[in-house]
Amino acid sequence: MAQAQGKIVQCIGAVVDVEFARDQMPKIYDALKMEGSALTLEVQQQLGDGIVRTIALGTSDGLRRGNTVYNTGANITVPVGKATLGRIMDVLGAPIDERGPVDQTLTAPIHRKAPAYDELSPSQELLETGIKVIDLVCPFAKGGKVGLFGGAGVGKTVNMMELINNIAKAHSGLSVFAGVGERTREGNDFYHEMADSGVVNLENLGESKVAMVYGQMNEPPGNRLRVALTGLTIAESFRDEGRDVLFFVDNIYRYTLAGTEVSALLGRMPSAVGYQPTLAEEMGRLQERITSTKVGSITSIQAVYVPADDLTDPSPATTFAHLDSTVVLSRDIASLGIYPAVDPLDSTSRQLDPNVVGEDHYATARAVQGTLQRYKELRDIIAILGMDELAPEDKLAVARARKIQRFLSQPFHVAEVFTGSPGKYVSLAETIRGFKMIVAGECDHLPEQAFYMVGTIDEAFEKAKKV
């Protein structure tokens, strides 16, 4: 069947109106191609009288009224499967790494339904990250969804890079990284880091373990809105082959923001704080597809920017509902020089349950949180009256809490070049042993600076000898 042909009748920034014959009107999400150009338009609204409103997935420079447009009659499709490994692609699956075309033998549409309820597979298995604070208070589930929440400059991307370093490199499965509206420099650094560590095999790309999809912050809103779906489609294809996939998204907030821009351009009435009225639905459509089935699993780690450090902002608040573990990064903790700046009282995990992690882990985590909470309550009294006015048991709780706080810090492998101290991977058993000793009072004689930026508790004892 010949492709339906239309003409551009209006072009306002990234929004392009196209007129077709009334009986050939494209469906919502159909991909339209420009004559003599690589630009793709995606249908968002049917305005009636054969006119559709579309979003340009690329720059709309040079478009003018009267240009010819063809309807492909299908959703945007992107290459999936082994051909994507070791490659950097854009929202349409076109390569941007200057290593030749991507094999298009296997393709899949970026819009599809989430798996049915009876296909889903819940998981109780823990995923060890080697980061003490995460493994202790907000453990990750294999096949679960994790959010890294934080304002500007508290370390979301560095934490994500460390998780990739600790999990993806040791992980026998495959990883997909979707860079949604983030800095191009970070995408470039990530690629070179993956190449240096062998996760991207430059000699034989098919042996690589990661596929990368980028729609960075200099791209039009259409690209940033759809690039998460492109990455997810590639991850789903690996999952449906029966593999265990790690899916990293940096940053899910930019996905929301791109939706806000597109919504405003389409003329929709904004809702709370200027967000799109379809925020919950758009987020749900993406998040419900990121799931594990009986065939394979997707473990997803998403960075979530928190505007003005306000966790009640509609965007992070909508994301919270979909996650199994939430890692909240705090500016107050970062200002103390404690990195990773994870707030152990705000961060949560569904896995922190004695039936899942075991009684020992659960009791240690709760004792650590209880000690830190007591310190938080006493801080006002200390600020007004000083430490000397506290009861002896409260003084002891404060001393232990300060040691715990410092022991929650850890040198990262990915930050080695900045800090000069080698990164540490701490096993879950060592993490529990260390915090158990501090809570039990076995380290009361050590100075608190011995606990700062060390790996295991044995290193703290060694450091104490030098202090």
UniProtKB/Swiss-Prot annotation:
A GO molecular-function annotation: proton-transporting ATP synthase activity, rotational mechanism
Topological type in the membrane: Peripheral membrane protein
Matching Gene3D superfamilies: 2.40.10.170, Bovine Mitochondrial F1-atpase, Atp Synthase Beta Chain, Chain D, domain 3, P-loop containing nucleotide triphosphate hydrolases
EC annotation from Swiss-Prot or TrEMBL: 7.1.2.2
Compartments, record wording: Cell inner membrane
One Pfam assignment: ATP-synt_ab_N
Keywords for the protein's UniProt record, in alphabetical order: ATP synthesis, ATP-binding, Cell inner membrane, Cell membrane, CF(1), Hydrogen ion transport, Ion transport, Membrane, Nucleotide-binding, Translocase, Transport
Domain of life: Bacteria
Residues at which ATP binds: G150, G151, A152, G153, V154, G155, K156, T157
InterPro entries for this protein: AAA+_ATPase, ATP-synt_VA_C, ATP_synth_F1_bsu, ATPase_a/bsu_AS, ATPase_alpha/beta_chains, ATPase_F1/V1/A1_a/bsu_N, ATPase_F1/V1/A1_a/bsu_N_sf, ATPase_F1/V1/A1_a/bsu_nucl-bd
Subunit relationships: F-type ATPases have 2 components, CF(1) - the catalytic core - and CF(0) - the membrane proton channel. CF(1) has five subunits: alpha(3), beta(3), gamma(1), delta(1), epsilon(1). CF(0) has three main subunits: a(1), b(2) and c(9-12). The alpha and beta chains form an alternating ring which encloses part of the gamma chain. CF(1) is attached to CF(0) by a central stalk formed by the gamma and epsilon chains, while a peripheral stalk is formed by the delta and b chains.
Family stated for the protein in its record: Belongs to the ATPase alpha/beta chains family.
Role: Produces ATP from ADP in the presence of a proton gradient across the membrane. The catalytic sites are hosted primarily by the beta subunits.
Protein name: ATP synthase subunit beta
Organism for this UniProt entry: Polaromonas sp. (strain JS666 / ATCC BAA-500)
Name of the gene: atpD
